[in-house]
Amino acid sequence: MLKIIEKLIGSYSEREIKKILPIVDKIESLAPEYERLTDAELRQKTDIFKERLKNGETLDDILPEAFAAVREAAWRTLKMRHFRVQLIGGIVLHQGRIAEMKTGEGKTLVATLPAYLNALEGKGVHIVTVNDYLAKRDAEWMGPIYNFLGLSVGVIVHGLTSEERRKAYNCDVTYGTNNEFGFDYLRDNMAIYKEELVQRELNYAIIDEVDSILIDEARTPLIISGPAEKSTDLYKRADNFVRRLKPLYYNSDDDKQMPDTTGYDYIVNEKRHTVALTEEGIKKAEKYFGVTNLADPENATLHHHIIQALKAHALMKRDRDYVVKDGQVIIVDEFTGRLMYGRRFSEGLHQAIEAKEGVRIERESRTLATITFQNYFRLYKKLAGMTGTAKTEEQEFREIYKLDVIEIPTHKPMIRIDHPDKVYKTEKAKFEAIVEEIVETHKKGQPVLVGTVSIEKSEMLSEMLKKRGIKHEVLNAKHHEKEAMIIAKAGQKGAVTIATNMAGRGTDIVLGEGVAELGGLKVIGTERHESRRIDNQLRGRAGRQGDPGESRFYVSLEDDLMRLFGSERIKRLVESLGLPDDQPIEHKLLSDAIEKAQKRVEARNFEIRKHLLQFDDVLNKQREIIYSQRRKVLEGENLRDSILNMIDELVDYKIKVYTGESPHPDDWDIKGLLQDLKFIFLDGELSEQDARNMTKDELKEKLISIAKEKYLKKEQEVGELMRELERVVLLRVVDMHWMDHIDAVDQLREGISLRAIGQKDPIVEFRFEAFEMFDQMIKRIQEDTIKIILHANVENMPKRERVVKEMYENSPSDAPVRKSVVKTQKVGRNDPCPCGSGKKYKKCCGAV
């Protein structure tokens, strides 16, 4: 029904493009006028546009002229002129949307249009790429356009100094990777001096390969961490223990029909990527480690280590999920097959794999600052993205990032032939058929690009081709420069290139001489990915800019996708046909089944990401509060009134804790109150007896008076340095407590799923307890700040310095040291919400 309506009124993208076309016509109509301008006159347009913006015109008002200026500048500097479809793409990006443009349609050039226009406001534009090589390449390649028009261009790559970074961020347009932009944001929010800040306000970002960054890497946390003091011995013991256990593999989604676990020690569900000890496994663990009850909270760390060891053995496969190289465990990116140097699996899984592989176990690390890409990129005032494949994830872009996806038509018609899948019963038969196909195609001289899902599979296929004497290149994407070079040659006559799925993304495959007559590039997929988008990316390597090309996927019933998500009906159908292993099966039912399996996995992964975002949003809200307050302190806000206000709030809170609701002094814990305040500011100024003879209000007034008197005395002692002392202390205290809070919230998140057993919504419970913990953290910050300021030794006045001098980055990092979460005083339903919104708790974060 939907398709019939679309035929009548056009798709959403077609309708939106129709609205844009008059603007495109206007840009094109300006071409003759701009061609007549001298270089100086064209350059002067930038100053004119800036002046018009100052006088009240909007970016939309000057868009046609600004785009016309960029178009002409591109021709004069690079001999490249934006096509009509590229102008459409540029407008879509300026509107804060995602432009889906096929491979080879010139996305890099398209970005110069909205980047120039938005840079005219003087607030900076970030163009985000997936690796350092592309960031440098694009900045150097497109730089002359911006420079010609009088704008500066910077590039942020790994290894730059703070000064170099600051200079790059102060440019009008800054190219860089998602990792570098994110880490700089975190580092800025750990800075102790204002002069250490490198980033400006996050204004406008254009993300290249937006699906890779906002979908595939959405759950990847950027973590700045420092080493934690923790023994690695338990990882070895847990590893020795799980080697003795017997697994039961069970891949059903039905929780009600659990299998008989008699004789098995743990269950592995590859589909859900989970492991769990059985009753027998729990008994063995209790005996092996000498504990009476593994489920006891005091054994939570032990249980966590056992589960990570089970995951390392049952779910994590060498040469698929990771490789062991030079005595180190290195992660393999599941989407690109790249080795991810410097990254580590989180929550102790990396150490568990190190124990399994018998290499040196690195110490766990402590999280100092963290943010996910999802939350980092949502900080920008305006966000846009480009990719060849976004339509399948349109719902996710809209729901999570409020980003529309607009399909941009190709400059020339697409003539690539996409053949139906060939399905085999066994993996062995499938790979033999692939080798035959490569051999036959190679005889004609037609280039072949073979996409594999893992390093292990690409090396296996390489061995098979060597035996047949076929010269080929294997691309496991260890070096981006080499990768781009190999991929660029993949379109030459007779070339055979094996590459893990999306290696070389961002580099065009240009057809060599005479290749178009042979049918163009042939793309062979050795397995269907669980995401249709990744398959489409591989297909998109052929048939760029109207070139000929063809693609085909080879599938076996032993592939992970079919094994875990294919239906039993399909397996029965294949068995009933009784065909030999080496005969391919072609049936519409099979093609439909593969697509249904992919859609099922995509929907499941989206739900997981959405669910995790609900948890992450809680910490994100708190992070925004802490970082914004921290920035005010850093930028020199006078803290005197804030400190005096802290004294009022602290005394009020302490009196509530030690006197409760009772109006009778006999029910109050005066001794406890005075003892507690002794560590903060009291020094015998108030006796227990005198305190007992006061009302609550009198007691509060007296204590506040004593504290403020101490504060004023310290102010006189220190003189001008008091403001600096306040800043030093507050920044130190906030950073230390924020680190502890990240740890505590992480641990709460791990244990909260158990609440579902008690018929409670884990999200609601998590939200409530996390804000309760946040409220307690704020109180601890107030207490420690007052205590340290009032007891500061003025002679040894501290200089502002980093809370942790040596930091190292892991993305994603290992889990921090866990601290047990202490249950704290509850927030009342009618109390102000601890998130700082000003609303009552029941109307804000406590709303169910």
Curated annotation (Swiss-Prot):
Gene Ontology CC entries for this record: cell envelope Sec protein transport complex; cytosol; plasma membrane
- List positions binding Zn(2+): 833, 835, 844-845
Name its cellular compartments.
Cell membrane; Cytoplasm
Q: Which UniProt keywords apply?
A: ATP-binding, Cell membrane, Cytoplasm, Membrane, Metal-binding, Nucleotide-binding, Protein transport, Translocase, Translocation, Transport, Zinc
Q: How does it sit in the membrane?
A: Peripheral membrane protein
Bound cofactor: record note: May bind 1 zinc ion per subunit.
Q: What GO terms describe the biological role, i.e. biological process, of this protein?
A: intracellular protein transmembrane transport; protein import; protein targeting; protein transport by the Sec complex
Annotated function:
Part of the Sec protein translocase complex. Interacts with the SecYEG preprotein conducting channel. Has a central role in coupling the hydrolysis of ATP to the transfer of proteins into and across the cell membrane, serving as an ATP-driven molecular motor driving the stepwise translocation of polypeptide chains across the membrane.
Q: Which reaction does it catalyse?
A: ATP + H2O + cellular proteinSide 1 = ADP + phosphate + cellular proteinSide 2
Question: Is the Isomerase keyword given for this protein?
Answer: no
**Gene Ontology MF terms in the entry:** ATP binding; metal ion binding; protein-exporting ATPase activity
Question: Where the protein is mainly located, per its record?
Answer: membrane
Q: What class of enzyme is it?
A: translocase
Its EC number(s): 7.4.2.8
Among InterPro entries, the record links this protein to: Helicase_ATP-bd (IPR014001), Helicase_C-like (IPR001650), P-loop_NTPase (IPR027417), SEC_C_motif (IPR004027), SecA (IPR000185), SecA_CS (IPR020937), SecA_DEAD (IPR011115), SecA_motor_DEAD (IPR014018)
Give binding positions for ATP. Answer: 86, 104-108, 508
Which cofactors are named for this entry? Zn(2+)
Q: What is this protein called?
A: Protein translocase subunit SecA
* Family membership: Belongs to the SecA family.
Oligomeric and partner information: Monomer and homodimer. Part of the essential Sec protein translocation apparatus which comprises SecA, SecYEG and auxiliary proteins SecDF. Other proteins may also be involved.
